[in-house]
Amino acid sequence: MSCSRAPVGSRAKRSILPALAAALALAGAACASTQGAPTRADVDTAIRARTASAGIRVDSEPPLPPDVNLGDGLTQDEAVAIALWNSPNFQATLADLGVARADLVEAGLLRNPVFSLLFPWGPKQLEFTLQYPFDLLIQRPARVDAARLNARAVGERLVWDALSLVAQVRTAHADAIAADRRLTLAEENASLTRRLAGIADARLRAGDISDLEARAPQSDAARTDVVHRALRHDRDLARLTLAALLGLDENAAPVQPQLSASYDTAPCVVDDARLKEALASRPDVRAAEIAIEAATARAHWERDRVLALVGILDANGKGDKGFEMGPGVAVDIPLFNRNQGGAARADAEVERASRLYLAARTHVIAEVRSAAARAAQAGQAMDAWTRDIVPSLETEQRQAESAYNAGETALLNVLDVSRRLVDARMQQVDAEADQFRARIALDRAMGRYCR
């Protein structure tokens, strides 16, 4: 019985087909993907859920968010919306998300196969080899998991950066409002002290008081004028600071901060339920938790990097039976180097990530409690000025004006009471600004607006 020999071309095709199938499988596995990585839309949604702001700007959109009009004044909500939309520093921070997504793409890519071709020269026959490191294919799932978790951690940190920016803008807006009100009161106080100095000067010329007695009102008037000029500079500086946080260019109209209903000073009682809510809401805590998972995935990857396995496809043009092709492997025998250093480093990173997570939780609890204490103290101080001190001085002023109209007291006494009332209102403005700042710090510590 005789068997006919298959043509050389048929044997070559049968040998090449498995190699092509393997190559296609590898190509499919190596497709770049960012599945599971957060996008700008995800960050935008998380920010909106915590701040009810206008969201993140896309580069092709105008420099101001929709429904924001600087012509009628700048409210706190508008300032926050503009900052998230337009702040150069925050826009630069958002680029970290693109870097993390690119790292995920790179983690999913596989190494290119190495093709070696030996040309026939003299007695040398034509040969070629195709080599591929299959160990990288085995390590790919752990590598991709680590990169995906890292991208998620970056997304959470970006949300926390946004909340920090919101707190900075709200504080700057509150400071600008307080600076405007201080300047208004300083102008009123300067006018009163000038009138007192004028009365003292008239009494000095009439011989009713001595030169020594007249110097005190004059010095007080000079002092209030200096304070008035300083507060004008403070007002301008507060507005410039706010504009810088908003990322407005030099051609933009000057900001005119406006007090609005968004300045919520209602009490926010912090109990165990609030602490749990803060731990669940804080993006930095969630980022630290995800960092543990990412470090664990990297540890699995490092433990897989022990055995180097290279698949080989060898072919020559003039074997015993003509064209020949066959598989082979090259194995890195782990006698000495089993990636002990990489595995130990990965384990240390897992421990460090765990410690940082515990530190983040401890920090959040302490921050929320201290912010709540400051908010309570600021609220008590504000109540004292609003309910007791300022109303008492207002009553005293009305009584002094009635007595002056009845001819029972001098104008000097009326002006002195008015000046003390202006001073009290100045301190009331400071107390209100402290209350706003304390509430803003509490909102930031909670990871969302405390309602």
Residue ranges, per PLM feature:
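Alpha-helical heptad-repeat coiled-coil segments that mediate oligomerization/polymerization in large
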Residues: 210, 364, 371, 407-411
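Amphipathic alpha-helical coiled-coil scaffold segments and their short linker/junction regions
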Residues: 69, 77-86, 146, 209, ...
